[in-house]
From Swiss-Prot:
GO molecular function, one term: ATP binding
Function description: Catalyzes the condensation of ATP and 5-phosphoribose 1-diphosphate to form N'-(5'-phosphoribosyl)-ATP (PR-ATP). Has a crucial role in the pathway because the rate of histidine biosynthesis seems to be controlled primarily by regulation of HisG enzymatic activity.
Cofactors required: Mg(2+)
Protein's pathway: Amino-acid biosynthesis; L-histidine biosynthesis; L-histidine from 5-phospho-alpha-D-ribose 1-diphosphate: step 1/9
Keywords: Amino-acid biosynthesis, ATP-binding, Cytoplasm, Glycosyltransferase, Histidine biosynthesis, Magnesium, Metal-binding, Nucleotide-binding, Transferase
Subcellular location: Cytoplasm
Keyword Cytoplasm assigned: yes
A Pfam family per the record: HisG
Regulation: Feedback inhibited by histidine.
Catalytic activity as recorded in UniProt: 1-(5-phospho-beta-D-ribosyl)-ATP + diphosphate = 5-phospho-alpha-D-ribose 1-diphosphate + ATP
Name of the protein in its database record: ATP phosphoribosyltransferase
BP GO annotations: L-histidine biosynthetic process
PANTHER family: ATP PHOSPHORIBOSYLTRANSFERASE, ATP PHOSPHORIBOSYLTRANSFERASE ATP-PRTASE
Organism in which the protein naturally occurs: Erwinia tasmaniensis (strain DSM 17950 / CFBP 7177 / CIP 109463 / NCPPB 4357 / Et1/99)
Length: 299
């Protein structure tokens, strides 16, 4: 039986978000032995229990107060929210933050042989999907009537099997659609993983742990988005070089032995367009440019 004084976190047991959720917790310093068949794991160094469940069970576990936190795709969360509202419920939860993984899109797709001129051409079509409420919300906004064909897997085979005229399914690269003779025609929802919390006041010990976890998650995400840069540069070009580096604070500047015209610069910067940035740095006279990954970061 689980100890109610420990923080309970639900995450996907296997699937699209499982590995990255596990990596996030590990990089936050939570030591957990996640053996393949165990559905409950206990942190060795913090009062945290991990429940490994199906992804579509996670929103309900949080909304019903069974667990304190959940790592879940926004698409699954929104579908559960719409489902419960359609049943007359008033589901409550808090979104603590969007995470930097699990990106995908929910899209309409049709046969490569069919013409598509916009959502209106789907009027009265039969559409196969695992996300009936998200699909209905979108097509209601477009004032398009349709017939839903609910499938919980292998949605992409529905048109060839004669079950549907089109599909609404998750797309990452589009390779699965192409393999089944389909093409993406409309994106109706963009999703990433997010961290959610149950509604209601949290006991002080759990809230303290959540605050600590949030600080660490922020540090992990910032570290993944940033790089530590070291370079040599002409002293008179310092300000131009600093301007080139997005997100950089004022750098550490050190003299170079035996060369008063140049300095060493150390700084943290985002990696956005960094190959282009490196070429511009070189054009300004920078040399010995090193870009290093950052494991942990805290402001």
């Amino acid at each position: 039986m689980l100890d109610n004084t420990r923080l309970r976190i639900a995450m996907q047991k296997s699937g699209r978000l499982s590995d990255e959720s596990r990596e996030l917790l590990a990089r936050c310093g939570i030591k957990i032995n996640l053996q393949q068949q165990r559905l409950i794991a206990f942190a060795e160094n913090m009062p945290i229990d991990i429940l490994r469940v199906r992804d579509d069970d996670i929103p309900g576990l949080v909304m019903d107060g069974v667990v304190d936190l959940g790592i879940i795709g926004e698409n699954v969360l929104e579908e559960e929210l719409l489902t419960r509202r359609a049943q007359g419920e008033d589901p409550r939860y808090k979104t603590l933050r969007r995470l930097d993984f699990g990106g995908c899109r929910l899209s309409l797709a049709m046969s490569v042989d069919d013409e598509y001129s916009g959502p209106q051409c789907l009027q009265n079509s039969r559409i196969a999907t695992s996300y009936p409420h998200l699909l209905k919300k979108y097509l209601d906004e477009q004032r398009v009537s349709f017939k839903s064909c609910l499938l919980n897997g292998s949605v992409e085979v529905a048109p060839r099997a004669g079950l549907a005229d089109a599909i609404c399914d998750l797309v990452s690269t589009g390779a699965t659609l192409e393999a089944n003779g389909l093409r993406e025609v409309e994106v109706i929802y963009r999703s990433k993983a997010c961290l959610i919390q149950r509604d209601g006041e949290m006991p002080a010990n759990k809230q303290l742990l959540i605050d600590k976890l949030m600080t660490r998650i922020q540090g992990v995400i910032q570290a993944r988005e940033s790089k530590y840069i070291m370079l040599h540069a002409p002293s008179e070009r310092l300000e131009e070089i600093i301007t080139l580096l997005p997100g950089a604070e004022r750098p550490t500047v050190l003299p170079l032995a035996g060369d008063k015209s140049r300095v060493a610069m150390h700084m943290v910067s985002s990696e956005t367009l960094f190959w282009e940035t490196m070429e511009k740095l070189k054009a300004l006279g920078a040399s010995s440019i090193l870009v290093l990954p950052i494991e942990k970061m805290m402001e």
